[in-house]
Amino acid sequence: MQRRFALLFPLVLSSLVFSFHLQGQDKSADALGHPWWQHAVFYEIYPRSFMDSNNDGIGDLNGIASKLDYLQALGVDAIWIAPCFPSPQVDFGYDVSDYENIDKMYGTLADFDRLEKLGRQHGITIILDFVVNHTSDQHPWFIESRSSRDNPKRDWYIWRDGKAQNEAPNNWLSTFGGSAWQWDSKTNQYYYHFFYPQQPDLNWRNPAVSAAMYGVTTWWYKRGVAGFRLDAVDTLFEDPNLKDNPVLPGKNAYGDPNMENKYNDKLPEVHDVMKGLRQAADPYGAVLIGETWTKDVSELKDYYGTNHDELQMPMDLMLTKLKFSAQIFREHIGAVNVSGEWPTWVISNHDIVRSWNRYGDGKHNGDIAKDMAAMYLTLRGTPIMYYGEEIGMQNNDPARPEDVKDPIGRRGWPREKGRDGERTPMQWNDTPNAGFTTGIPWNPIPVTYKTYNVADELKDPNSILNWYKALLALRHKDPALLEGEYIALNQDDPNVLSYLRKTKNEAVLVAINMSDNQQKVSFDLTKEGVAMGKSNTLLTNQINLRNIATISNVTLEPFAVYIAKVE
């Protein structure tokens, strides 16, 4: 069992904040007149793993519907559901065979309609995961495309002759290992796949493809969907001349040469598609969230569009690669805010090792989980949570190659163990299978569910779950946290991340000790237009900070968080 930091310093939250309960809201705009998504809290659900309603071991839409009360009480405004469309499940749904239906393992369109309606009744809207780069090889479009060289859909995908007999058109590699070109013996050509061979890339240079895909989004908007998370947007285009990518030293987990994806990743034409998708979204007030892996803030900024006509919410996935460090986080947050755009903060998702494992030091993981929550839920911008982060769920990586379900883990073992570990079933209680199912769960549940589960944490005022609930209640309640500018404080402090969220009428101080040592800090906010008068504690996990009257000198215990209104 982890050391419960909060046993030493119990959770303190003002009664004003505790009394706040998030209610349904107008999804065209928030209370401040901004687009509804700007101040919303998003929550990613991996549908296989959230809740199983029919006890077949696989989560489903009715399972999600059964947990809307929980999500509403947590403070969630929108749920992003990973792909639930019909699929052969080669890549667990990221190989779509029909964009306008629901896979029967998850339910039916009627189940989706019920979920969407119930969600709105709970003040929660639905975001779907749109796989824009490729389809399944079982999609009717591709079945027709590969039927002959002269059929109407041949040019909907990337078909090319080889350089020579038994030689692919160029040296491009699949991100999941091996050549990115698959030979088709029926038509004697290769087709291109950035991912698995069963995931052929669409030809976005063909106007018929873009029209069809824009049409898919409209079909779902009319059904009540509030937006899309766009999968793998970087890889939509390839160099038409098929230039070889530069080869780099060394080999990857699959034994292939390392390579710079210079000619098949992040080509400028991607932004034209983002604009087209945005034009389809705007009439419905829908939001577009991008899976945007970028090397720097400048590249991330490009995805908003020069005229803010592309993605409203390109994800800052750079954050997931940073070390747990006050100084490193400060530098990155500062760079993002200097860009002038509205950030989208992500610390975990279905493709990334859980934040508990990435940021934790093996000794203070629970404390660090609270620090991370305090940071990304109080920053300027929109947060996207990942299911289970709020209870301290941990990776449960396979111990043996024969236990691996994710194909990239089977192919890349042991250097690449796959993504099974971050996709385990949600831990609802301490009964067998964590209350997820009475059947056999599709993915093993870690033994830590006996400690980290919703039912037990709801009873513990010092739990990670109640910490998240308090933070989200405060975030929804306080105008400075919703709307205020971000002002970095004490920028030379290597241990304490501190900043001000400030509007014209209000200022909130956030101070997070990211070290395992006591830290003494002082704040002079006069130059920020805040007199050194009253301070009112809003939220802390250090009991002796509850009633302090001044912030000129504050002692923060290891991993302590202090959030206060300052005047």
Segments from the language model and where they lie:
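Bacterial N-terminal signal peptides that target proteins for export
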Residues: 1-9
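Loop/helix patches that line or flank the sugar-binding groove of alpha-linked glycan CAZymes
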Residues: 37, 241, 245-263, 271-281, ...
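Beta-strand-rich binding/interaction modules
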Residues: 518-542
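Bacterial N-terminal signal peptides
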Residues: 9-17
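Acidic/aromatic-lined carbohydrate-recognition and catalytic surfaces
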Residues: 27-218, 222, 235-295, 426
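C-terminal beta-strand-rich structural cap/linker in extracellular carbohydrate-active enzymes
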Residues: 548-567
